[in-house]
Amino acid sequence: MEQRLIGREAELKLLNEYINSNRSEFIAVYGRRRVGKTFLIRKAVEDHFAFFMTGMNGVAKGEQLVNFSISLQKYTHSTTLQTFKSWLLAFYALSQYIETLPEGKKVIFIDELPWMDTAKSGFIPALENFWNSWAVLRNDIKLIVCGSATSWMINNLIRNRGGLHNRLTHHLIVKPFTLHECEEYFKAYHFGYSRKQIAECYMVMGGIPYYLSMMDKSKSLAQNIDQLFFADNAELKDEFNDLYRALFKKSADHIAVVTALATKGMGMTRQELVKASGGKDNGAFSTVLEELEQCGFIRLYEPFSTANKMTSDIRQKRNTLFQLVDFYTLFYFRFIKHNKYQDSSFWSSSQNSQLYHTWAGLSFEMLCLNHIDKIKHALGISGVQTLVCSWRSSNTEKRTQIDLLIDRKDETINICEMKFYKSEFEISKEYEEKLLEKLRIFTEETKTSKSLLLTLITSFGLKQNKHSDIVQKQITMDELFI
């Protein structure tokens, strides 16, 4: 079955504009591994490349150059393989070949570019020379480079301070699917999943197209999850190590950080994280955190305080929290890494267990955080400046916390409660009292003078009863799919 391009309308429109411009373009496309970058580019160009190659992971300069030579030979149709001792000569040969082509746009696509930049290879200076001394002087070259190592792409191309400084004409990030795009995908491939099941799928693996492509429409969601993660021959059983090793050269440091963060849902301060991960509080540790953030595995946020400033640099604050937000990584640590059950049908048999319900509640909170723009739209505050954060009582005996609050510039705070249920959520007398106490403690400790709006986000809405009036605003899961 032919693969279809789902969503990506904005990204496709931009790529087409760049490709059809009247000047040479240097375009960097980046994003998390398995997110569909290469597929998007191939669809945009319709595989009409003047030259296309993919870098090799974990090999030295010599083999990378041989790989380049083989790719070039496919386009030149030469009967002999031309070999190169340096990247400077390799790119010169590419320019010589391109000059033999007829008039018209010439798309050069180099995939997994970061893998080609091996130690002391001279790759970046050669790429700089290729662009600065040849490609930019023409008006028909469309150089598209792509990579999953997001931190490399940002630091070596987008923020380059050498020969490529300000030479990149465009950069485009390809993000995971939203819930809406996941729904489009499942409809296009004739899956009969409900929105609740699509949300649960997202809570397991995020909106990663590659993972979705491995699912079988003839199986239930639970069966698919078992097949991908828990079966004896599960295709994604080793995905965790493969993922981090492909993205980071010293992946052990990054794995140590996410391992520590997986133990604390709300996140850790830098000092807590240094201690928990066994790292050292230095520049190298800052680099690891920055790379994880750039790749979308963690986020930085500031716990709620009346002293919060919406324009200040969060990285300079001691109370900044680092939180693990990658769905697959969270699922891995909770269920896969220490799967003591050794049950190939583990997920199917866990659907009504307390283990499942606890996970679903926490993961739904992360799903809401991931779709905060949809929540703001549903609240009618898309244009209002906000801080999205959490709060925990300083009184350890009370143990009161709010996992999601939206601190608004219009002197209002949405206190969000998130509930993932199979039917309408019903507020009991006990839960109403708990909510009132939470609001009282929050107001008392924070001394906030802002208005508080209790906001309930549920899978199927709120059941009306004599306790439901405590909620000022409710949002259903459907509004996250818009």
Language-model features: locations:
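A cross-kingdom feature that marks ATP-driven nucleic-acid transaction machinery
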Residues: 314, 318-482
